[in-house]
């Protein structure tokens, strides 16, 4: 399956995606660049789907990716039940203009 490489080594890219996924689930909304936002949307939807499954195996899979146990608890107890009837599309990506320093396209990623 194709994915974005972000001009980073595998470990750095994986750590970046883990960090921004954890931040999104913790705060509900983050601002990042457009390519990162589009990749984050894929991963965040997978994590919320794990939360909807709700069993021990899904919880351990989420803990293997999300860095904070409190965020996993929040995901399974508060976020996942909110999307119980929704079949995917748990995140929204809104364009937020361009960053001043380097004119990178920015986006707001939020939970629907």
UniProtKB/Swiss-Prot annotation:
Keyword annotations for this protein? Ribonucleoprotein, Ribosomal protein
Q: Which domain of life is it from?
A: Bacteria
SUPFAM superfamilies reported for this sequence: Prokaryotic ribosomal protein L17
What's one GO BP annotation on this UniProt entry?
Answer: translation
Annotated GO CC locations: cytosolic large ribosomal subunit
The record ties this protein, via Gene3D superfamilies, to:
Ribosomal protein L17
Q: Which GO terms describe its molecular function?
A: structural constituent of ribosome
| Pfam families xrefs | Ribosomal_L17
Listed PROSITE patterns: RIBOSOMAL_L17
Which family is annotated?
Answer: Belongs to the bacterial ribosomal protein bL17 family.
How does this polypeptide assemble, per the annotation?
Answer: Part of the 50S ribosomal subunit. Contacts protein L32.
- Protein name per UniProt: Large ribosomal subunit protein bL17
